[in-house]
Amino acid sequence: MRYIRLCIISLLATLPLAVHASPQPLEQIKLSESQLSGRVGMIEMDLASGRTLTAWRADERFPMMSTFKVVLCGAVLARVDAGDEQLERKIHYRQQDLVDYSPVSEKHLADGMTVGELCAAAITMSDNSAANLLLATVGGPAGLTAFLRQIGDNVTRLDRWETELNEALPGDARDTTTPASMAATLRKLLNSQRLSARSQRQLLQWMVDDRVAGPLIRSVLPAGWFIADKTGASKRGARGIVALLGPNNKAERIVVIYLRDTPASMAERNQQIAGIGAALIEHWQR
């Protein structure tokens, strides 16, 4: 009897710790909002089941910024699957087609780039001109929004081209999504029959090869963990990341984090997103 009582006491002693540990990522988000003097939206979703594991302002609108480029290339791959596009098709363009921040496309004015190369540039280097050239192939912002509606996303909307879509005005619904809608759309593109298995692998690989996300979740990723991501940024107080994460080099969860309406510097925004990512990973490992 004494042994049983001791076991019960030991079990009860662990309960407050478990309850305290559970909201830890949300406590970090609240702290980030306080330090940023802005809003944070976040969702952590199980890739296989679609179950929401953690959420904060998940149904509020946030500017997509360059995170839309993953959805854009998903729409391009859907056209490839349908036989309406080819990743090997070459697109030629002129100097006047280039916009600010085009580190890859500006080097290929003479020879052009294939559709596949443009997707790689748009996702791995966040090349804005590459995104605009691809956007034209799917019918512009209205065409991409129509694609979203077709796959069941009735929230996410693209209204403008690069670079105007990064304006992120307070209260402006243009070029926005919600963390919940973006996560659900990513899951449809990467874990359903919306895209062929080959196209899913290609989209994921472009995200794995992201070369401009170093200061965010990648900076706190434990050894041996998988990450595939795409970031977004605005000069007007916004920042974002969409990512797939998991231990043992496997994609297990979707994480979407958006910031908006903060006066914080870009370095501070990066640091806060990294902190939220670290809290999620720490909680995951318990």
From Swiss-Prot:
GO terms for biological process: beta-lactam antibiotic catabolic process; response to antibiotic. This is Beta-lactamase SHV-46. It is an enzyme of class 3 (hydrolase). Residues 1-21 form the signal peptide. Its EC number is 3.5.2.6. InterPro entries: Beta-lactam/transpept-like (IPR012338), Beta-lactam_cat (IPR045155), Beta-lactam_class-A (IPR000871), Beta-lactam_class-A_AS (IPR023650). Disulfide bonds join 73-119. It comes from Klebsiella oxytoca. Substrate binds at residues 230-232. The class A beta-lactamase family has a specific amino-acid numbering system, sometimes called Ambler or ABL numbering and often misspelt as Amber. A multiple sequence alignment was used to derive a consensus sequence and then the consensus was numbered taking into account insertions and deletions. This allows use of identical numbers, e.g. for active site residues, despite differences in protein length. UniProt always uses natural numbering of residues, hence there appear to be differences in numbering between this entry and some papers. Keywords: Antibiotic resistance, Disulfide bond, Hydrolase, Plasmid, Signal. It catalyses: a beta-lactam + H2O = a substituted beta-amino acid. Belongs to the class-A beta-lactamase family. It comes from the Bacteria. The active site is at residues 66, 164. GO terms for molecular function: beta-lactamase activity. SUPFAM superfamilies: beta-lactamase/transpeptidase-like.
